């Protein structure tokens, strides 16, 4: 396979015939957040809400959100594909269909979804399709997965507002997928809160420099 063919393959979602089979049992992961000590899989306090963000390599994306006041816990994992309970190595092949994502569990009385969305839009480049900077492939695509119709509408409205802001600077179009939350598979313990354990580790987050104009209250 030529370099061009290999690159093109990385940028395409796998067919059902190509996807890896995965497994029935979940991949072992950490029980508690390395920074906060809160349970990664719950139970969480009443009133907490959830959203999944994919914005390239999940190491830097997770650190971005666990630092936000009002975010109760974060976890990295895989979502949006077909393979059940994939490993990191399997996901990196591009043959699971999954994106690297961050689960953000937050208190809406302290931080709004719009505030989280503003960080999402500003801290990565949502116009790059199946890549994020030097991280190339469907695994690194930009996604927002919401857990109810109201939150999905809020996310779509924020996308429209940010699209206009980008267009005014000659940038775009936005390629971010917004959809109802699919199954979320927790990544291995090694990847959870990676940049807290490895402060000098890789972080590929790079924004466009365009501010998000959406109202922060919702």
UniProtKB/Swiss-Prot annotation:
Xref: HAMAP family: MsrA
InterPro entries: Met_Sox_Rdtase_MsrA_dom, Met_Sox_Rdtase_MsrA_sf, MsrA_MetSO_reductase
One term of GO molecular function: peptide-methionine (S)-S-oxide reductase activity
Keyword terms, alphabetized: Oxidoreductase
Species: Brucella canis (strain ATCC 23365 / NCTC 10854 / RM-666)
Domain of life: Bacteria
GO cellular component terms listed in the entry, alphabetical order: cytoplasm
Protein name in the entry: Peptide methionine sulfoxide reductase MsrA
Record PANTHER family: MITOCHONDRIAL PEPTIDE METHIONINE SULFOXIDE REDUCTASE
Pfam families referenced in this protein's UniProt entry, alphabetically: PMSR
Family to which the UniProt record says this protein belongs: Belongs to the MsrA Met sulfoxide reductase family.
E.C. number: 1.8.4.11
Signal peptide segment: none
Gene Ontology BP term (one): protein modification process
Reactions mediated catalytically: L-methionyl-[protein] + [thioredoxin]-disulfide + H2O = L-methionyl-(S)-S-oxide-[protein] + [thioredoxin]-dithiol; [thioredoxin]-disulfide + L-methionine + H2O = L-methionine (S)-S-oxide + [thioredoxin]-dithiol
EC main group: oxidoreductase
Role, per record: Has an important function as a repair enzyme for proteins that have been inactivated by oxidation. Catalyzes the reversible oxidation-reduction of methionine sulfoxide in proteins to methionine.
Coiled-coil blocks: none
Catalytic residue list: 57
